[in-house]
Design a protein with these regions (language model features):
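Intrinsically disordered, low-complexity regulatory segments
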Residues: 2-151, 180
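Prokaryote-biased recognition of long, low-complexity C-terminal linker/tail segments
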Residues: 142-182
């Protein structure tokens, strides 16, 4: 399967889920690779992002298409919702896209009729800036909670759990979704 569909008037490509993620603490400072209570809480003044290595090829494809000189309008067709908005905004940010007209396609189903309606009625991407801001905020909260509480609980209780389970090392993973399920 090709990674791009080309037509005379359009080029179509896709993300494969998330292409960009928040960087681990050691990308801010290599000393943070070693977990220590003295480095907690980890709260960066500015968040860093990186391309996910396993999907780097697709990111390069999407990035190069978004930045092509002959592309003047981008139709953003990621999932209609906060996470879909976040997926596109991270790609756009990391790819340093600028000077393009950006329209958001918002659809409620995958029928041909609904897709065509979504394209016809696409709105300027800026109308979804609040949704994007909420997605970034949710991601930062998840990141800070996960990084800090996982490290804290692992440092405090990891050895006890390892001894109980008779394993060499135990990481206690904490996160918004995981914690609710537990």
């Amino acid at each position: 399967a090709s990674d791009v569909y080309k037509r005379q008037e359009a080029v179509i490509t896709w993300c494969v889920g998330h292409l960009v993620t928040m960087s681990y603490p050691e990308e801010y400072d290599p000393a943070l690779k070693k977990w220590s209570l003295q480095t907690l809480p980890f709260i960066p003044s500015e968040f860093k992002y990186e391309v996910i290595p396993s999907v780097a090829k697709q990111f390069q494809i999407v990035s190069s298409l978004l930045n092509r000189e002959d592309v003047d309008t981008i139709y953003v067709c990621t999932d209609s919702g906060r996470e879909g908005e976040y997926i596109y905004r991270l790609v756009e940010q990391k790819a340093q896209v600028s000077g393009k007209k950006r329209l958001r396609v918002w659809i409620d189903s995958q029928t041909e009729e609904e897709i065509l309606r979504g394209i016809r009625e696409a709105k300027d991407l800026s109308e979804y800036d609040n949704l994007s801001a909420s997605a970034y905020l949710r991601a930062k909260e998840d990141y800070l909670m996960g990084i800090n509480f996982s490290r804290l609980l692992t440092l405090k209780y990891g050895n006890s759990i390892s001894n109980y389970l008779n394993t060499k090392y135990s990481v206690i993973s904490v996160g918004r979704v995981m914690t609710c399920v537990l």
